[in-house]
Amino acid sequence: GLAYEYLEQDLGKKSELLLAANPVHKVYDFVXGMKPEVAK
């Protein structure tokens, strides 16, 4: 099988990596015209 690492995250405190890797977040920022700090 595939090797993987399971990590639990508190979704109330999203990591910078998660925010950077989330294309929906990027699209929302683009469409809404907000800075990432505001869109959280």
Curated annotation (Swiss-Prot):
It comes from the Eukaryota. Disulfide bonds: none annotated. Belongs to the GST superfamily. HSP26 family. On the 2D-gel the determined pI of this unknown protein is: 6.2, its MW is: 27.1 kDa. This is Unknown protein from spot 207 of 2D-PAGE of etiolated coleoptile. It comes from Zea mays (Maize).
